């Protein structure tokens, strides 16, 4: 019996491109892992992530959660199909004063038109600082990552999935 799995070559390339994006560079977001229904990112916390009161800006947690929950769903969406966040709910539990932040997420459900994922932001000691859920709308091919990358003039991505014998 044949099945499909994520192509490691595809994942390496999308991580490389995502990490090089202007937003990821500005926020210091680095993707550590994308696998079946799961993603993990890290953020090297700097002063630019602080608000006027010198605490972490709440938008940092939101950005981490939006990013990591999107990538957790990515593995479950068919190739050349787009999707976007339509609702992000963030619960801040604790301030972060310094050090590396980690975001982890898992896909909860991926349907034909709506997907749902949940994620956590943790500090270096594994303490949960924020929790969030993301609702995403599944779109068409015009909104896919593959089409966007080609539109930017980059080489086409390797196939997202590869066949396997089960």
Report the location of each language-model feature:
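Terminal targeting signals and extreme-terminal segments of soluble enzymes
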Residues: 1-166
């Amino acid at each position: 019996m044949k099945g499909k799995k994520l192509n490691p070559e595809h994942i390496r390339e999308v991580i490389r491109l995502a990490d090089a994006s202007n937003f990821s560079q500005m926020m210091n977001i680095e993707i550590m892992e994308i696998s079946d229904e799961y993603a993990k990112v890290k953020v090297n916390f700097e002063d630019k992530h602080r608000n006027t009161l010198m605490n972490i800006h709440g938008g940092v947690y939101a950005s981490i959660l939006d990013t990591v929950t999107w990538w957790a769903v990515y593995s479950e969406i068919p190739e050349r199909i787009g999707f976007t966040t339509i609702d992000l709910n963030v619960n801040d539990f604790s301030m972060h004063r310094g050090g590396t932040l980690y975001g982890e997420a898992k896909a909860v459900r991926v349907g034909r038109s709506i997907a749902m994922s949940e994620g956590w932001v943790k500090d270096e000691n594994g303490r949960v600082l924020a929790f969030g859920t993301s609702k995403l709308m599944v779109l068409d091919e015009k909104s896919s990552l593959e089409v966007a990358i080609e539109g930017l003039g980059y080489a086409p991505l390797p196939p997202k999935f590869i066949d396997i014998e089960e």
